[in-house]
Amino acid sequence: PSIAAVFTWDFLQYDLVLTITGSRVIPWTFPPDWSSPVLERLEWKTDVLEAFDASEQRGSLRLAPRKRWEFEAFFEGRVRRYAEAASWGWGARVWALPVWPDGAQLGAQLNAGALSVPITTTLRDYVAGGLAVIYTDPFAYEVAEIASVAAGSLTLARATTSTWPATAWIYPARLARIADRVALPRWSGQASGGRFAFELVAPVDYTPATGATTYRGRPVLTERPNWIGGYDLELSRKLAELDAMTGARVYDDESGIPAGRQRMRWTLTSRAEQDAYRRLLYALRGRRGSMWVPTWTDDLVLVATIASGASNFDAEWSGYTRQLDGDTGRRDVRIELANGAILYRRITGAVEVSATVERLSVDTAFSFTIQPADVVQVSFLTLARLDSDAIELAHWTGDVSESSTTWRSMQHEL
């Protein structure tokens, strides 16, 4: 982003030296208003081919997602004038956009000529060959190029040109373009603000990971969602209608089972949780990947002791035998015990023992005795994918963020 060149003209009597310094990129130095969250949007692109029976073939069309940052900012006085001037003059060009949630304070004075910056880099968006913005206010900043990243420091490609106080902040930065339309409502002759959206110029890669737990060869979602506000379950069918417009209509349930859509909300309260969530999203790659997703609800209630070695259990009557027996999406269960153990089983048969009890057979016998009081929850386990290629994280601070995912159950033969 910076220009640092020396031109030398070699004359017979003397040399003429011309030093040129400058910058090819301008940083966006107007911080967000943290009273509303800073939105990070990751967007993959998946080609989904659906068969008659609702089974799918899916392929990723992007190696890495596009990323978008969106936030509100407010200006007053000289800052307002500079913000409007910069938006006017540089609006169509590329900005160095600070990644606001990943900033950290220097903590100690950084002298001019420094090539190493002691700073916390763990789980922040610093990358070798990328940019960093040293910042104190919209008018006092320096854009630096990162040569390498260590756990507790950055090594710069060129020395700093100014001395920075301990209170200065340093942010990782990404090249981005602002949206083609920027609204700047003016509250008075001195105050203005608006909502600003930036699309990163290049996709951003991340190390994918789904966790260690698997079932039938596929990863399992093991983190519970945030129940504040609840989450919705929607059942939709691939129902074809034949209507000749002259008599009764004919319907064909092409898939035989509904596609369930569950919306789950997540509250991430540390950078480690944010990192694990991002790794999961990158492993799924939007609608491309799939994993086993529990309903996290009390779907079956144990009513009798399960003996060690038994391959069935008695559950409170809920219509499973009549309505669900063997259906894809309702034949796998997650059994959570009070001691922390989690068991995964496939239901292979069901019979009504009485008007209040159903006996369900499973594929793998239980290796120890389980009392009804030992069971915290029995939930259905569904193979599902994300229902959208775009996922947003709402950052309230650098360490706290919220997100939501909608899972779509799949027709499968696992």
Predicted regions and their residues:
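Oligomerization/assembly interface segments of phage tail-like spikes and tubes
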Residues: 44-51, 58-77, 184-206, 237, ...
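Cys-His-centered catalytic/binding microenvironment captured across papain-like cysteine peptidases
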Residues: 25-41, 136-141, 152-232, 355-414
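Feature for long, exposed domains in two main contexts
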Residues: 1-24
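Autoprocessing Asn-cyclization modules and mimics
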Residues: 74, 78-163, 207, 221-227, ...
